UniProtKB/Swiss-Prot annotation:
Domain of life from the UniProt record: Bacteria
Any one GO BP annotation for this protein: regulation of DNA-templated transcription
Keywords: Cytoplasm, DNA-binding, Transcription, Transcription regulation
GO terms under cellular component: cytosol
Main localisation: cytoplasm
Listed InterPro entries: Integrase-like_N, TACO1_YebC-like_2nd/3rd_dom, TACO1_YebC_N, Transcrip_reg_TACO1-like, Transcrip_reg_TACO1-like_dom3, Transcrip_reg_TACO1_YeeN, YebC-like
Protein's recorded name: Probable transcriptional regulatory protein stu0195
Annotated family: Belongs to the TACO1 family. YeeN subfamily.
Record-level Gene Ontology MF annotations: DNA binding
Protein's cellular compartments: Cytoplasm
Length: 241
């Protein structure tokens, strides 16, 4: 069982509450939607990457006008280019952090991420210094009770499903990354329409618990990283956050 397992729904609830109050999340989704639409067709029915981003944007309650603006921009003649990046580092007392970025200026982003680590009790690491302690998984969360039935549905659809957990009226499905879309389609085919989370996540193999000053320092570091416009996702191995 993944260490994130039983408490995933609580983590999602906290994240949704935080992101919902932060307009930065809308701007970040705008960039992600633009990139997905620009790299393929601006139609989600013929562009699976765009469809996936729009599904996540819906879960984050991104306003329609933000989505439409990003797609319209992709349809235009703009040649703005964005590059994906990943940075790894350490916080206090064994905490590990992965930062995924999407930026039009790599030098700016690298400097900002390094500064965020340095000014908030962390240290940047080399590529691979942290990520080997995480596993990339597809994660799907939705309302439900019967984990066994969901597991059977996914197996029948030939989905490479790693685990299905049920707790407090919430089902959490873990898949191999390449089978996330396949799992979603299988669930939809069985009548599941609403999803709280559909994400590719970096799941820590082990977690650490921080307390007191260490915890406050770590929260400040995460806040500083997430405040950067170029940072799309921040993963870490700290429990109960």
């Amino acid at each position: 069982m993944n260490p994130m397992g039983r408490k995933w729904a609580n983590i999602v609830a906290k994240k949704t509450a935080k992101d919902g109050a932060n307009s930065k999340i809308y701007a970040k989704f705008g960039v992600e939607i633009y990139v997905a639409a620009k790299q393929g067709e601006p139609d989600p029915e013929s562009n699976s990457a765009l469809k996936f981003v729009l599904e996540r944007a819906k879960q984050a309650q991104v306003p329609k006008h933000v989505i439409d603006k990003a797609i319209d921009k992709a349809k235009g003649n703009t040649d703005e280019t964005f590059v994906e990046g990943r940075y790894e580092g350490f916080g206090p007392n064994g905490s590990m952090i992965i930062v995924d970025t999407l930026t039009s200026n790599v030098n700016r982003t690298a400097a900002n991420v390094r500064t965020a680590f340095g000014k908030n009790g962390g240290n940047m690491g080399a590529s691979g210094s942290v990520s080997y302690m995480f596993d990339k998984k597809g994660v799907i969360v939705f309302a439900g009770e019967d984990a066994d039935a969901i597991f059977e549905q996914l197996l029948e659809a030939d989905v490479d499903v790693e685990d299905v957990e049920a707790e407090d009226g919430t089902i959490t499905v873990y898949t191999e990354p390449t089978d996330l879309h396949k799992a979603l389609e299988a669930l939809r085919a069985n009548g599941q329409e609403e999803f709280q989370v559909t994400e590719l996540e970096m799941i820590p193999q082990t977690e650490v618990t921080l307390e007191g000053e260490d915890l406050e320092t770590f929260k400040g570091l995460i806040d500083a990283l997430e405040a950067d416009d170029d940072v799309q996702k921040v993963y870490h191995n700290v429990a109960d956050m």
